[in-house]
Amino acid sequence: DSDNERDMIAFLLSDEANNFKRWKNEFKELFLGDRILMIYVSAIVNYSRANDIDLMILRKKERHSKVNGVIAEKQKVLPKKIHLIELSQDEFLKNLEEKQKSIINIVKTAIILYGQSKYVELIKNVKSI
């Protein structure tokens, strides 16, 4: 049954995120209700060699004013620059449909720190990337 499959995928994504507790704890303030928070590329592979910390937030509606404040505070204490992409869920899906390479690469490499069930629900109808 597809609900069980989606639940299993969300569980596996959550389990994978638990391998990155440092980042989950560091950025938990950015998880605001209906959001999906991802970290991707070099910070998860080899932080010491990373140039920056790449994050993506997917939101249902408008931007939340708290996000910029949280990023500014984190930037004061983290030695690497934070590179944030914030998209609505519709913008994200449109980028996937248009086969935007940068978004596809994020999907392939990202760790879903928060919002795993929402992420699975969001991408369930994507045909191919």
Please report, for each region that a protein language model flagged, where it lies by residue.
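Catalytic core of pol beta-like nucleotidyltransferases
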Residues: 1-35, 45-50, 59-129
